[in-house]
Amino acid sequence: MNYVFRLTKGQDLRNEIQNFVNTHNIKAAIVKCAVGCLYEAHIRLASAENTLHKKEPFEIVSLIGTISVNECHMHISLADKNGAVIGGHLKEGCLVGSTAEICIEELDNYILTREFDETTGYKELIIKEK
């Protein structure tokens, strides 16, 4: 099944996607795309421990990710007013400007979960066929 939904000004992008996934009981899916804008961004850059926080207008250039049982793992790319692009892990606190349009595709033949991997130090994706 495919899902398309729209968020409006002030909504938290990450939290609202997670709420949508929980409401629709989605267990395995991909975030195919999103378009829209933010007025506040919280992202974790590659290999960084801290979250980058910026309060300024951004266009959502890309949003992709995997959705597993009880968890979304998403990466976002944002362009500022000069066209400079930053990207990283989508964190709580990314607040929608005028709109954000989200497209999710459910993966009917899979169950996706995450388990801690001692090698990487992160919860990594576990893929099981139904």
Segments (PLM) and residue ranges:
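N-terminal intrinsically disordered, cationic/polar leader segments
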Residues: 1-73, 77-130
